[in-house]
Each structure stands twice: as C-alpha cells, then as structure tokens.
Amino acid sequence: MTDEYYMNMALFQAQEAADQGEVPIGAVIVGADGSILAAEHNRTEALHDVTAHAEMLAIGAAAAAIGAKYLTDCTLYVTVEPCPMCAAAIGWAQIRRIVIGAADPKRGYTTMYARSPFHPRAVVLQGILADECAAVITDFFRRRR
C-alpha cells in the first residue's frame, strides 16, 4: 500500500469527524506489516475532553492493539500537522515515521518548537494529499462561521 492509500483512510476519518461536528482531523497508525492498528478522528466534543485529538486516540488504540507503549515500527498518517500536545505524544510513543497531509501554520507543532519534538530517528514526510486534507478542514470552518 502507498502513503496516499493510508492518507485517504485518514481523510475518511476526518470526514467522519466533520459529520459529527468535530474538528475534522483524522489519524491512522499502520504497523510494519502494513496492518491498520488504529484509525481515529477528533472526539473532543463527544468525549468532553480537550485531549481527545485524533493522534492521541490513535496512539492509545495502537498501543493497546500491540500491547506496548512504544510504536517504533509504526507509521502515523495524520491529515493536519499535529499540535504541540500531539507532537509531544508522538515523540514519547517513539513513532519513527510520520506522514502529514496539510500544514497548520497557526497551531501546528512547528510554531512552538525550534527543534523537532519527534524521536531523533523519526522520518517526517509532509504534503501527502495536502490539498485534499486542507480542503476538509477549511470547508468545515467556512461552514461554521
């Protein structure tokens, strides 16, 4: 499977979030063998929990799926650049490959960190299906305002 394939899965999760009135961000964590360990979207409204971001929920679900707290052999696909909280959790989980759709110049981790918060050996790919990822979140906020 390709990065675009898994990012499309994350986009599906983002659309699910939008349909539920949540900020439309989706995340998918894939194991080294290509298996889907977790597919989540933001649930901050439904759970009344400011930490219930797609990445946080996916990290918890993937860790439970493999029975370990470190996700070193996994790849995270996320539709929008992680916020500082999620970026720190990604670093703590030691995810070694992070694939990001759209940048977030207002709230993304790059606005807060001079250095990457991710594991030192992490590979970060940005811009996979960026236009599609940006459109989902832009359309959501355009409709709400």
Regions found by a protein language model. Name each.
Residues 46-57:
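A short, polar/charged loop-to-alpha-helix boundary motif
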Residues 21-25, 72:
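Short, basic and Ser/Thr-rich N-terminal targeting/leader segments
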Residues 1-20, 36, 82-145:
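Zinc-dependent deaminase
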Residues 68-80:
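Immediate flanking context of iron-sulfur cluster ligation sites
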Residues 25-34:
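Short beta-strand scaffold segments in enzyme catalytic cores
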Residues 10, 14-17, 27, 38, ...:
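Small-residue (primarily alanine) positions within well-ordered alpha-helices
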